[in-house]
């Protein structure tokens, strides 16, 4: 609507004036007498701007840039909010997987405890082994209770961010990671071109430049086309009807305004310089965010293969130790330690696995591409300006 208001300056202004009443007149034309007449007035005027020093164009540019800035700001907020929702979503998945690991670990400890207890009751095992197995079983039960609390916390946080409780959620996989750029430099270039925070700052600067041009229009003349028609009755003490038509070109040129116009221009120029600094600050913040997300993704990518190998090795070790324990080649402590090692390896792998997925979405958000990656519609204003600038560049 503000853009429409600015564009209205291109159109004509038409006014209708009507008047009816009594008029008392005593002037040289009526002296020594006076006249009291019933006065009637009717007129219509039309004014069309022909030249205003590009004030109207500048106002249209300013309001358009301001609208685009607001659109990009909304997109930026949407991207950040979406990332928070993704983080909460992945945290629920993470806690579910960790819960499954602790449940499996508890089942293994229950099986071991049952076997050790049976051996002790039959006189083959020692009571100390039973107590050792009981202690590890209690720890596994405690770990399970802890994970149950963690998953409830994750579900509650998801509801706080998204507004609903998570139901039937699934692992998003590597779809987002497959869309990551090849290099850090590529990621920063994309962010400089597309990030809504930077686009908003650039649009604000465009608005300040347009505002500066609007202020400079005060140094130009204004030219209007004026058209008018009138039909009056009993005016100024003269009985009878009075009709008239006119068509005029009018030029208005301010010669002196006490320096107010120049002061206004200088004020806006200062504002424009401030907007440039905000653009530079936005670039620095965006580049930093991209680097942090990139480093997080690289770190996870580098760690995952080794952690996966650790889990596989821990599984093989547990199977081997279980077989060796049954023939007396391994102690109970050795067997219990393999269960804890497998749990520890699984937990660390799961943590880094979901850290990697989150880092992929974080990288997309830091580049301003998260909504696009998730196929979420953006504000029309932001898309229009982004496409125009992409064509220009």
What annotation goes with each model-predicted range?
Residues 13-36, 47-76, 199, 218-245, ...:
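Small/polar (Gly/Ser/Thr/Ala-rich) solvent-exposed segments
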Residues 39-41, 87, 132, 222, ...:
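Transmembrane beta-barrel architecture of outer-membrane proteins
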Residues 43-45, 89, 224, 248-250, ...:
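Membrane-embedded beta-strand positions in outer-membrane beta-barrel channels/transporters
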Residues 125, 130, 134, 164-228, ...:
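Amphipathic alpha-helical coiled-coil scaffold segments and their short linker/junction regions
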Residues 147, 196, 352:
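Metallo-beta-lactamase
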């Amino acid at each position: 609507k503000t853009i429409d208001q600015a564009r209205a300056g291109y159109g004509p202004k038409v006014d209708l004036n009507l008047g009816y009443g009594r008029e008392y007149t005593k002037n040289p034309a009526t002296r020594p007498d006076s006249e009291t007449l019933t006065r009637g007035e009717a007129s219509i005027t039309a004014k069309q701007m022909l030249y205003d020093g590009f004030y109207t164009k500048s106002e249209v540019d300013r309001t358009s840039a301001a609208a685009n800035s607001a659109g990009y700001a909304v997109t930026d907020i949407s991207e950040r909010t979406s990332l928070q929702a993704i983080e909460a979503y992945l945290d629920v998945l993470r806690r579910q997987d960790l819960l499954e690991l602790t449940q499996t670990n508890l089942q293994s400890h229950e099986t071991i405890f049952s076997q050790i207890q049976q051996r002790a009751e039959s006189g083959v095992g020692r009571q100390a082994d039973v107590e050792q197995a009981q202690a590890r079983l209690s720890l596994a039960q405690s770990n399970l209770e802890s994970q149950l609390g963690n998953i409830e916390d994750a579900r509650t946080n998801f509801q706080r961010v998204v507004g609903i409780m998570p139901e039937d959620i699934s692992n998003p996989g590597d779809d987002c990671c497959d869309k990551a750029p090849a290099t850090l430099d590529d990621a920063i270039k994309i962010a400089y071109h597309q990030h809504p925070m930077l686009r908003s700052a650039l649009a604000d600067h465009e608005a300040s430049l347009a505002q500066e041009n609007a202020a400079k229009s005060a140094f130009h003349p204004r030219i209007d086309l004026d058209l008018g028609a009138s039909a009056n009755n009993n005016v100024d003490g003269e009985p009878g009807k009075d009709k008239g038509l006119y068509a005029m070109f009018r030029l208005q040129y301010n010669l002196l305004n006490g320096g107010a116009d120049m002061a206004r221009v200088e004020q806006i120029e200062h504002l424009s310089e401030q907007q440039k600094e905000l653009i530079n600050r936005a670039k620095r913040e965006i580049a930093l965010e991209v680097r942090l997300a990139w480093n997080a993704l690289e770190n996870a990518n580098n760690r995952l293969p080794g952690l996966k190998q650790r889990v596989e090795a821990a599984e093989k070790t547990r199977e081997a130790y279980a077989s060796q324990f049954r023939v007396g080649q391994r102690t109970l402590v050795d067997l219990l330690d393999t269960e804890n090692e497998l749990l520890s390896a699984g937990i660390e792998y799961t943590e880094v696995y979901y850290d990697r997925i989150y880092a992929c979405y974080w990288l997309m958000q830091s580049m301003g591409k998260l909504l696009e990656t998730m196929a979420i519609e953006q504000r029309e204003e932001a898309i229009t300006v982004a496409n125009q600038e992409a064509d220009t560049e």
